[in-house]
Amino acid sequence: MRILKLLELVVKVSLFTIALSSVLLAFLTFRATDAKVEIIRGDHPEIYDDSAENEVPTAASIQREAILETLTNLVLESRTPGTRQIREEKLTIPISTEPATQKTISVLDLPNNCLNASSLKCEIKGISTYNVYYQVENNGVIYSSVSDSAEGLEKCDNSLNLPKRFSKVPVIPITKLDNKRHFSVGTNFFIPESLTQDNYPITYNSYPTNGTVSLQTVKLSGDCKITKSNFANPYTVSITSPEKIMGYLIKKPGENVEHKVIAFSGSASITFTEEMLDGEHNLLCGDKSAKIPKTNKRVRDCIIKYSKSIYKQTACINFSWIRLILIALLIYFPIRWLVNKTTKPLFLWYDLMGLITYPVLLLINCLWKYFPFKCSNCGNLCIVTRECTKVCICNKSKASKEHSSECPILSKEADHDYNKHKWTSMEWFHLIVNTKLSLSLLKFVTEILIGLVILSQIPMSMAQTTQCLSGCFYVPGCPFLVTSKFEKCPEKDQCYCNVKEDKIIESIFGTNIVIEGPNDCIENQNCIARPSIDNLIKCRLGCEYLDLFQNKPLYNGFSDYTESSLGLTSVGLYEAKRLRNGIIDSYNRTDKISGMIAGDSLDKNETSIPENILPRQSLIFDSVVDGKYRYMIEQSLLGGGGTIFMLNDKTSETAKKFVIYIKSVGIHHEVSEEYTTAPIQSTHTDFYPTCIGNCDTCRKNQALTGFQDFCITPTSYWGCEEAWCFAINEGATCGFCRNIYDIDKSYRIYSVLKSTIVADVCISGILGGQCSRITEEVPYENTLFQADIQSDLHNDGITIGELIAHGPDSHIYSGNIANLNDPVKMFGHPQLTHDGVPIFTKKTLEGDDMSWDCAATGKKSVTIKTCGYDTYRFRSGLEQISDIPVSFKDFSSFFLEKSFSLGELKIVVDLPSDLFKVVPKKPSITSTSLNCNGCLLCGQGLSCILEFFSDLTFSTAISIDACSLSTYQLAVKKGSNKYNITMFCSANPDKKKMTLYPEGNPDIPVEVLVNNVIIEEPENIIDQNDEYAHEEQQYNSDSSAWGFWDYIKSPFNFIASYFGSFFDTIRVVLLIAFIFLVIYFCSILTSICKGYVKHKSYKSRSKIEDDDEPEIKAPMLMKDTMTRRRPPMDFSHLV
C-alpha cells in the first residue's frame, strides 16, 4: 500500500510540474531572453548583460538637473525586465523634466557601479598614461567605464600594472602626426561622443554617455607663462599658472617622456642641465612651448666669471685641454720617475699585466720591425729608413747577463731553437714578456692608469566668464547662475538675469539689489532660450555656444583656464574644455585646436649663410658679351654646400663677392590621402539571443547597423537551451561588434602622385640676399642670373602611384600596403578616417570570425575573434625610406630631404660690365625706401627691404652705424632696384642713414634713410639683450675653428681655383700632400744632421795616404763597420 501511495504522489507531482511548465513555456514564447554583450581582445573575454545597460540614456540634459533623472531611470531599468527596444528609440531622450520631483533626490544616494568597483567583480581592459578603461559586473550586468582615478581598482583583474594614482594635469589629444614627435606626453582614453546607432553606452568619470572609446596621443593644455632668463648661472627660468594644477616637462623631439610630466600649482622654477642646452630640447608648459637655445654652459660660465678678461676666458674655456696637458706632464715626469723606481718591487704587477696582455705583446713584438718609429725604443729617432740593433729590442731579463746571439723575434731562420716551441709555451712567454719593448709597453700602461686616476680627481671647470550686468555670472561647467563670490558650483541659481527686448534686469537672491541696464547683446542671434541662464548665454556668447551648452555638457568647467595664448573664441574655449573632460565632439574642430601651438618650439632656425665654412674661389674674366660679363658656375646639388666667388676683371681694383649657398636639397612629393590604419586595442560586442524564430525574428529587437553585423541560427536545440526554452532547431543570436582603436600608433596612407627634385638656394653678395626654391621642371630666372637643375636621381625608390605610410614617428615607410577598399592580407587594415571611424570593413562577419557557446540551462555567449579586417601586424614588413622626419603640408605634399648629391646646379650670372668700371659722376638715388622687421641682438636679425631708383649702373659698398650686414656690396642697375638685406644691430637703426659708396669711393657717398623699423622680440626663454650673451657671441666669432681651418688652406686657393666645383677638395688634398712632404724632408734632414754630429764631420781632417797600401775602395764611414764586442751595459740601476 505504501508503494502504491508513493507512486500516486509521484504521478500527481509530475502532472502538476508538466502543467506549470506548459504555462510558463507559453508565457515565455512571447518574451525574449536577456541579452549579453561580450568584449574580447586577445586572451581577455568580457561578457556584458546589456538587457538594462543599453537602455542608459545620454547625458544631454545633465546641465539642467537631468542627471538625477537619468541615474534614477538607470537603476529602475536595470531592475525591471522588459522587451529590448529598437536602438533608434533608445537614443531619443526627453529634454524637458520636472525639477520639482528631483530636488529631494541626491546623486550620492544613487548607486554607481563604476565607483563601487572595489566591492564588485571588475577587470582592467586598458591603462593609458592619464586614465584607465575597465568594466564592472553587478547582478549579471557589466558596466564599461573610463576613469582618471585608480582608487578602488586595486583588486580588479589585470591590475598588476595599474599605477597608484594618475597625473591630474590637463591634456588634450594630438591629431597631427607631425606634432607627435614634438609635443606627445603620453596617451589617454577619450570618448568620441555621438548619437549614431553604431555607438554604445559608456561612463566617463561616473558620467554616462553614448559613444566609442579611442586611445589618443595627448599634449599638455593650460595657461602658463614662461619668464625670460638672462641665462646667468644657474640657468633657471620661472613658470607660473593661474590654474589649480599644471604640467611641464623638458622634451627632445622624438623622445619618450610618457611618465616624466611634472605637476605644479602657482609657480615653479626650472634649472636646465647641460644636456638640455644642446639646442634640441623644448620646454613644454600647458599650451606654451619654448625652444631652449643652444648654449655652451662651460663657455658661458667662463664668460660670466671672467668677464672683460679675454685671457682668463680663454684659459677657462680651454681648461679641458689644459687638464689633459697637465696629466701628460705628470705622466712624463713624476709618474714615469715613480714607475721606473718601482719596477723591481712591483714585478708581480708586471707579470700579471704581461699575462693579461700576452697576445697583444706577442703581436707587437713580432710586428715591431715593420713599425715606422721602431728605433725610438732604443733612444734613436727615425721615421722609416733607419735600422736598429737587434739586441736593443730583444734583450732578455736581467737574470741573464748575456744577450741572445740572434734575436728570435727578428730572426728569419727556420731552424731556430725557439721555433721548436709553441707560441703558448713558457719559453716564448718569458722571452716576450721580458723584452725591452714589452717592459716599456707595460710601464706605459701603468703610467696611463695612474694618470686616469688623477684625471678623475681634477675638476671639470674653473668656473573667461560671462557677466549679466554687475554681479551675476555664468561660469563654464556650472549649470547655474552664480554671483561674484563664486567658489564652487552651487545646487541652484544664486541670481537672476532677465534679458528683454530693450533692457536687461539683474537681481541677486537674498538681497534687495535689482539692476537694470540697456540690452547690449550679440545681434542677429535667432534661437530659443527660455531659462534665465540660457538667455544670458544667448545674449553674451551667441546661439552656437548655447547649442553646445544645451547638448554638450561640461562635467568640469576648468574655470581658471582661459587659453589666452591660443586666441580661441568662446566656442573654441568651450570645446577645448570638453577635450579636457575626455570627450571628442568633432574631429575637425579637435584637429584645429590641437594644431594651435603657442611658442617657438616648432620654429626652424633660419640661419644665415655660413660663409666661414664655405670654400672661396676667384673668377677673372675680361671678355664682354652684349655689354655683360657672363660667369657660368656649376655646383654639386648637395644640401649645406656652396661657394664664395670673388668676381673681378683685369681693370677692377676690388673684387665683388658673390655667394651661392644650397640650403637644402630633396624631393617634393605630391600625394593624395587614402585612409588611416591603427591597431585594435579591444573589441566591443553587442548581441541578442531569441528562443524561437530565425534571424528576421532576432532583427526585430536587434536592428542591423550596416557593418560588422552577425547572426547565428539555429541556436536552440537539445542540450543548448536556456531555462524554460524547449524549442528545437529554432532561435537565433544576432548583434554587431565595434573595435576600439589605438590612434596613438596610427599610420596615414598616401598615394604618390608626383615627384620633383627641388633645392632651396640662397644667393648673397652684390645681388643682395635672397633665397629661392628651384625645381628640376622650371629653371629659375631673374634679371641677373639663371639657375637650372640637372638631376642624376629622380625619386629615390618611390614610384608614382605607390602607397606610402606616414608613421607616428613622422618617418615615411614603403612596402606592401593594401589599397583602399581592398580586403587583401597586407598592411593597411582596419581602414579608418582620421578620427577612427571605419570606412571599409566587413558588412557581415563570417563563421571563422567568431565562436559561440551555450549550456543546457545557461545563457548563450558569443566570442569575436576578428571584428573586420586586421592586418596591422604586417607593419614589420615595411621599409623606412629616410632617417629624417618629414612634415606634410595640408595632407597633400611633403618634402623628403636628402643628404647626398642629387645632381648638378648650373648657374649663369650676367653682370653688366659697368659694375667693374669707375662711375663718371656721383649717382642720383631717388624714391628710396628702407623698411626693417625683426629683433635686435639675436640670431634672426632685422630683415630689411631696400628699394630705390638709380640713373647709373655701378657697384657700391654699403654700411650703417651700429649694425653688421649680411652683404657689404651691391650691384646697382639703372632704373628700379630692390634688395633683401639682413642687418644685425646692437641699437635700433630707426631714422638712421645707410651710406652707399659707389665703387668704394668715400668722396661720393649716397645716403638712404631708414624709414621704418618694427621690433619683434622672439618668443623664447633667453634674453638676447644680455651683455653676457653678446660677449659670448663676440668671443665665438673671434675664435672660430672653421676660420682657422680656412686660413691654413688659403695658400692653395690659386691652384684649386682651376678645378671648379672641386675647389675645396683640391685644397685639402694639396694641404695633406704638403704636410707629408715636409715630414719627409725633415726626416732626411734629421738623419743627415745626426750623422754629421755623431761622426764629427764638422772638424777638418786630413788623411795621409801610404803609397805602399792599396787604394781604399770603400769610404771610411760605413754602416756597421764597428762591431760591438761586448753586450751593452745595463744602467737601469742608476735611474
UniProtKB/Swiss-Prot annotation:
Q: Where is this region: Non-covalent dimerization?
A: 177-195
Q: Topological domains (Lumenal): residue ranges? A: 36-314, 485-1067
Quick check: keyword Ribonucleoprotein in the entry? no
Attached carbohydrates are found at 116, 210, 588, 605, 980
Query: Disulfide pairs?
Result: 122-156, 224-285
Q: Which residues lie on this side of the membrane: Cytoplasmic?
A: 367-484, 1089-1135
Q: Which residues cross the membrane?
A: 315-366, 1068-1088
Signal peptide: which range, if any?
Answer: 1-35
Alphabetical GO CC annotations of the entry are: host cell endoplasmic reticulum membrane; host cell Golgi membrane; membrane; virion membrane
Site positions for Cleavage: 484-485
Q: Which UniProt keywords apply?
A: Disulfide bond, Fusion of virus membrane with host endosomal membrane, Fusion of virus membrane with host membrane, Glycoprotein, Host endoplasmic reticulum, Host Golgi apparatus, Host membrane, Host-virus interaction, Membrane, Signal, Transmembrane, Transmembrane helix, Viral attachment to host cell, Viral penetration into host cytoplasm, Virion, Virus entry into host cell
Give the start-end ranges of region Signal for signal peptide peptidase: 437-484
Q: Where is this motif: Cell attachment site?
A: 41-43
Q: Name one GO biological process term.
A: virion attachment to host cell
Q: Which Pfam families match?
A: Bunya_G1
Domains as described in the record: The cell attachment site present in these glycoproteins may help in the adhesion of virus to cells.
More about this protein: Tospoviruses are transmitted from plant to plant by thrips as the insect vector.
UniProt similarity note:
Belongs to the tospovirus envelope glycoprotein family.
Q: What is this protein called?
A: Envelopment polyprotein
Native organism is: Tomato spotted wilt virus (isolate D)
